[in-house]
Amino acid sequence: MSETKIVVACCQLSLAVGDAEGNRAKVRSAISDAARAGARVVVLPELANTGYMFADIDELRAAAEPLNGPTVTEWANLAAQHGLIIVGGFAELGDGGLVYNSAVLVDASGVRTRYRKAHLWNREKDNLFTPGFDLPPVVNTAVGRIGVMICYDLEFPEWVRTVALDGA
C-alpha cells in the first residue's frame, strides 16, 4: 500500500483584539506562506479574526462577524486561489446579537461547514460566548475526512470519540 504525504500547516499568530484588518493581513500572509511551502491544509488559530481576550461582551460583539462576513469570505477566496483546505476559528455574530466561538472549514467550493464551540471554559461563558450544541462536524475533503473542534472541546473524550467514529 502506498502512502500519500499531506502537508498540514498550523499557523501560530500573534493577533490583536480590535485590529480586524491587521489580523486579516497576518492571516492572509500566513495562508499564502503555507501555500508556497506546499501545504494542502491550513489550520488557523481559535478566534483568528479577533485575537483573544476581551474586556467585556461589548468589545467582543463589536469585533464579531457573521458567517458571511469579510473574514470567512476572504478565507474561502484564498482557499480557492491556492487550492487549499482552510480550517479557522472566528468570533461569529449570530442572530439576536449572540456571539459564538466558531470555526469553519472552507475549500475551493466555499464554506463546507461551521462549528460552534460547545465546551466553554470559565472566562468564555462569563457573559461572553454562547455555547454551540451540535456535535463536531466531519467533512469529506480532497485529502480525507476532517473533523472540526475548538480547543477545550478536545478535553471531552466522548466529543473526540464521535469524530473518530465518524471517520476523521
Each predicted region: which residue ranges?
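Active-site catalytic loop in hydrolytic enzyme cores
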Residues: 77, 94-166
